[in-house]
Amino acid sequence: MPEVVDTCSLASPATVCRTKHLHLRCSVDFTRRALTGVAALTIQSQEDNLRSLILDTKDLTIEKVVINGQEVKYALGEKQSYKGSPMEISLPIALSKNQEVVIEISFETSPKSSALQWLTPEQTSGKEHPYLFSQCQAIHCRAFLPCQDTPSVKLTYTAEVSVPKELVALMSAIRDGEAPDPADPSRKIYKFSQKVPIPCYLIALVVGALESRKIGPRTLVWSEKEQVDKSAYEFSETESMLKIAEDLGGPYVWGQYDRLVLPPSFSYGGMENPCLTFVTPTLLAGDKSLSNVIAHEISHTWTGNLVTNKTWDHFWLNEGHTVYLERHICGRLFGEKFRHFHALGGWGELQNTVKTLGETQAFTKLVVDLTDTDPDVAYSSVPYEKGFALLFHLEQLLGGPEVFLGFLKAYVEKFSYKSITTDDWKNFLFSHFKDKVDILNQVDWDAWLYSPGLPPIKPNYDMTLTNACIALSQRWITAKEKDLNTFSATDLKDLSSHQVNEFLAQVLQRAPLPLGHVKRMQEVYNCNAINNSEIRFRWLRLCIQSKWEEAIPLALKMATEQGRMKFTRPLFKDLAAFDKSHDQAIQTYHAHKASMHPVTAMLVGKDLKVE
């Protein structure tokens, strides 16, 4: 088979050379919004007579490159939009196969680095200190430091980070001590060590006025002090989830499992940075009801971080398996009917995405072709939910959950510490179920893996918990004006917050509702008072799509006071599509753009067609 090419990276591929280790020494400068330092990369040649190699960089200033104490020649190529600039380094002596070299690169990041968000004190909860966090997935590590920015290469790392002494630095690694900075008494150096090889998109850094609370034998929760106790309460189920995940996936090899609650501008629900999962504060519902995101990030420990997609074309391997594990964890905690309820909710999300993107759109394929496509632009629920649907369908074909979990555990064991493609996964599936090949051959693999739109087959779902949501949503969708007085607050009294959310998701699929219906819904259910972010998001979308002008300020507020793209992008799109809020949406975007995460700002700008 021909070697798989990572079209998202400009660096020498893993067949030419591989980064084995990074030692990072850097200083965080909040005034200049820059990281300045040295990345010492241990690189192993994969071929004989290697005379030069190429690394990924993006908006980095390179001061010098040193090998064995001697400065060496390097050349930065032209910037190629989202891919950045290739950096070619000439080696002083040719390397033979398996020979290693340590390349020390002195670099500085740009204030507009797409990997970093610099927050002013006003953008934090404490309002006193600045804050910095990184988000390298998918291809932003190159805007943090020079690297082979591809998930096909895995490396260990150590780091020493100098920060103002009143702040705390954390990384996706084990904390390895702190000491005053000998070069500057107003600063402190934090040390880190990650002994498990990881793809560089999992390198992460945060610096802020952080505090921690212990919530389990291997877990601290970190945040600004204003959120730390609330976070400790919200995530108290972490250890029981970790234990279930170990039962399903195998031993937890990373030592510590800490969690960081970020400021509201963080773009994702969570990011599975090893030893330190990053999560959005929109999970702080007050009742632990959004803990499925926690189960998701815990599951990534095995599927994503141990077994990794070789290129971003195969992103579904990371996300589909992780959603599958996440739902099993929740099923173990809350029952099999709950697992099916969330699985069916996920099918609904997939339907929405396919409808939004279009059923022939290439990004609705499970395996995508990202040649000349920024992975951030291709990002959607498809790799998560179409991936999950395939695994759920296979579970039902091959003998049920226990049988398929046996496959999953074997899959993790087989491919741990490796990066793989869909073909590797499929070949292993066929060898694991060699006595059921006739069943596997009945699967329409081409339709599932390589065709756009919804999957060829919808799995079977237990409807127990979903039926009440469908029944209530149907009452609203079919109600005439004269029926509106038949609704009352008691409609929701037997529904969990998960079911209220699903009820709104069902109504939203049929939006718009007549304006009188939405006003009546507010009257009887007081939806505006609900703080659960998932429910609030769907409620406000329903209001805007049904053209309720009074909801405009509430929707603008939610779109801007947090930056989780799952919420912010659809809210802005809905506001821009409503004539009464179109101009305001664009004005609000321009007013907030400078304080938004760089990736969020770019994608919302594209959505609004102003960038």
From Swiss-Prot:
Pathway: Lipid metabolism; leukotriene B4 biosynthesis. The keyword Zinc applies. The modification N6-acetyllysine is found at residues 73, 337, 414, 573. Inhibited by bestatin. The epoxide hydrolase activity is restrained by suicide inactivation that involves binding of LTA4 to Tyr-379. 4-(4-benzylphenyl)thiazol-2-amine (ARM1) selectively inhibits the epoxide hydrolase activity. Phosphorylation at Ser-416 inhibits leukotriene-A4 hydrolase activity. activity. Its EC number is 3.3.2.6, 3.4.11.4. GO terms for cellular component: cytosol; nucleus. Pfam families: Leuk-A4-hydro_C, Peptidase_M1, Peptidase_M1_N. InterPro entries: Aminopeptidase_N-like_N (IPR045357), Aminopeptidase_N-like_N_sf (IPR042097), ARM-type_fold (IPR016024), LTA4H (IPR012777), LTA4H_cat (IPR049980), M1_LTA-4_hydro/amino_C_sf (IPR038502), M1_LTA4H (IPR034015), Peptidase_M1 (IPR001930). Its cofactor is Zn(2+). The active site is at 297 (proton acceptor), 384 (proton donor). Binds 1 zinc ion per subunit. It comes from the Eukaryota. One of its GO terms (biological process) is leukotriene biosynthetic process. Bifunctional zinc metalloenzyme that comprises both epoxide hydrolase (EH) and aminopeptidase activities. Acts as an epoxide hydrolase to catalyze the conversion of LTA4 to the pro-inflammatory mediator leukotriene B4 (LTB4). Also has aminopeptidase activity, with high affinity for N-terminal arginines of various synthetic tripeptides. Monomer. Belongs to the peptidase M1 family. This is Leukotriene A-4 hydrolase. It comes from Cavia porcellus (Guinea pig).
